[in-house]
Swiss-Prot record:
Gene3D superfamilies: Dihydropteroate synthase-like (3.20.20.20)
Function field: Part of a complex that catalyzes the reversible cleavage of acetyl-CoA, allowing autotrophic growth from CO(2). Probably maintains the overall quaternary structure of the ACDS complex.
Protein name: Acetyl-CoA decarbonylase/synthase complex subunit delta
Gene: cdhD
GO BP annotations, alphabetical order: one-carbon metabolic process
Organism of provenance: Methanocaldococcus jannaschii (strain ATCC 43067 / DSM 2661 / JAL-1 / JCM 10045 / NBRC 100440) (Methanococcus jannaschii)
Entries under HAMAP family matching the protein: CdhD
NCBIfam families: cdhD, PRK04452.1-4
Transmembrane domains' residue ranges: none
């Protein structure tokens, strides 16, 4: 039954249907429908059909210009290259049975450049950057994760390990720079000792970038971390690299050899480190990482040349490589507040991830990074490099994101 409030009448549904059939159209206002059961059928929007447009070849065939013949299926194998050389394997940390703190991380060991040639034995490793003093210049998309722990490097390291699953930690002793706080090597060593007690993952030990102070800081920190197989970062031709080599040999550590996008410079530095007595199996190269849009092509060129030369048998460059992927956050497109570029919370990790993936394709083994989102993503991508093609199932439905309006 249908009741019209305005007219105060009750109308039978059949009567209403007859009226509609007679006039063809009727508008109803202010009505109430009373029914034991009411079924309303609302037609759904028709599905979107992807138009199938003929290819150029099919159009030419229709016009009689060409004739399409069945092409037999051919077997195809990727062009697998066999290399006479190999990339050395470098270990960070030691098991407790050997006097270490337990956690062990290995990088390198490859015998090919591409995954389809041969999966690499060890996945790429990401090490979280932390600093010995708060860094006010860090962009907000990074500060939001660490604002509560930036005053305490030990708590910062714990958060990276416990909440974000860090495999390694890089500590930058920024405060030792004479132009900042000029903290002594002894103070840096005390902090290093506290960090070793706070977390059990291997460390990359960095200085402030001051060529006079860094060798002294790295030597002091290497002593308190004796036997833990850390990575001393870094030795270069502009400072007393022999002091760093001596500390690495005396206290059982590895050395990061830093050069500036020049394979010849990297090779020369490695040669000098070896001549100073350092085992080549203790060297990790850092050819310098330029951010996406800020010279990344120069880094690509240097890293691919170093990796290929190492695989071809040059034993002065067949070491694993490291990337300061954090450099990507210095790109203004990553951190600058510009609504036209989209949210910074997305742009910054995307810039760091893209820079990292690019370096990964060049053969980089160790990534120094800051943003937890970037770290998680790059670690997941890196796992695929240890698998054979076909073992990882990919979603090939390119139209899955298209929905009806």
């Amino acid at each position: 039954m249908i009741y019209n409030d305005r007219l105060g009448e009750v109308m039978d549904l059949n009567t209403l249907i007859k009226i509609i059939e007679k006039v063809g159209r009727i508008e109803i206002e202010d009505i109430k429908i009373t029914a034991d059961e009411l079924i309303i059928n609302i037609p759904s929007a028709p599905p979107i059909v992807i138009p199938q447009t003929p290819s150029i070849k099919e159009k030419l065939a229709e016009e009689g210009i060409i004739e399409i013949k069945d092409v037999p299926e051919l077997d195809w194998e990727p062009p697998v290259e066999k290399y006479p050389g190999y990339i050395r394997e470098v270990q960070f940390g030691k098991p407790k049975s050997e006097g270490g703190r337990g956690k062990v991380v290995k990088i390198g060991g490859q015998r090919a450049l591409y995954r389809f040639e041969e999966p690499q034995p060890n996945p790429p490793v990401v090490t979280f950057d932390i600093f010995d003093i708060p860094m006010p210049g860090l962009p907000k998309p990074i500060r939001q994760f660490f604002q509560d722990v930036m005053e305490d490097p030990c708590e910062w390291a714990k958060k990276c390990v416990k909440e974000f699953g860090a495999d390694m930690i890089t500590i930058h002793h920024i405060s030792t720079d004479p132009k900042i706080k000029d903290k002594s090597p002894k103070e840096a060593a005390k902090l290093m000792e506290d960090l070793l007690q706070a977390v059990d993952v291997p460390f990359v030990i960095g200085g402030s970038g001051n060529p006079q102070k860094d060798p002294l800081v790295l030597e002091a920190c290497a002593e308190v971390a004796e036997g833990d197989r850390c990575l001393l970062a870094s030795a270069n031709l502009e400072l007393d690299y022999k002091k760093i080599v001596d500390a690495a040999m005396k206290y059982d550590h590895n050395v990061l050899a830093w050069s500036i996008m020049d394979p010849n410079m990297a090779r020369d530095l490695n040669r000098k480190l070896v001549e100073a007595g350092l085992d080549p199996n203790r060297i990790v190269m850092d050819p310098t990482t330029c951010a996406l849009g800020y010279g990344i092509e120069f880094s690509i060129n240097a890293m691919v040349r170093l990796r290929l030369n190492g695989l071809k048998g040059d034993e002065l460059v067949n070491m694993p490589m490291s990337s300061g992927t954090t450099n990507a956050i210095g790109a203004r497109e990553a951190w600058m507040n510009n609504p036209e570029w989209g949210p910074r919370e997305y742009r910054l990790p995307l810039w760091e991830i893209t820079t990292g993936i690019t370096m990964m394709m060049c053969g980089v083994d160790l990534f120094m990074m800051l943003n937890p989102i970037s770290v998680k993503t790059l670690k997941e991508i890196g796992k695929t490099l240890t698998t054979k093609p076909g073992e990882v199932k990919l979603n090939t439905n390119n139209y899955e994101w298209i929905v009806s309006p």
